[in-house]
């Protein structure tokens, strides 16, 4: 698994990723999220086309609040499927 800094580049393919996030409590943590190359196609109510058309971003879903953009990402890597037993 190779971590890539968001300063170097962002994903180019829609899909699931692991990200390292700078937390508000001065700690970094890892979270499983998704990436899309166009947030407006994901949910135009939350991500209106006027502001988000063609804009990529990491996002997640919350059962109470719905889709939301994941901020403060410092690094990412592709989430690979389990190849175990």
Regions found by a protein language model. Give the residues of each.
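Secondary-structure transition motif
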Residues: 2-85
């Amino acid at each position: 698994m190779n971590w890539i800094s968001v300063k170097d580049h962002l994903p180019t393919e829609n899909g699931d990723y692991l990200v390292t996030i700078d937390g508000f409590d001065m700690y970094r943590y890892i979270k499983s999220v998704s990436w899309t190359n166009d947030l407006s196609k994901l949910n135009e109510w939350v991500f209106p086309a006027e502001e988000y058309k063609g804009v990529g971003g990491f996002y997640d879903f919350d059962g109470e609040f719905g889709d939301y953009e994941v901020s403060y990402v410092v690094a990412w890597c592709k989430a690979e499927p389990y190849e175990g037993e």
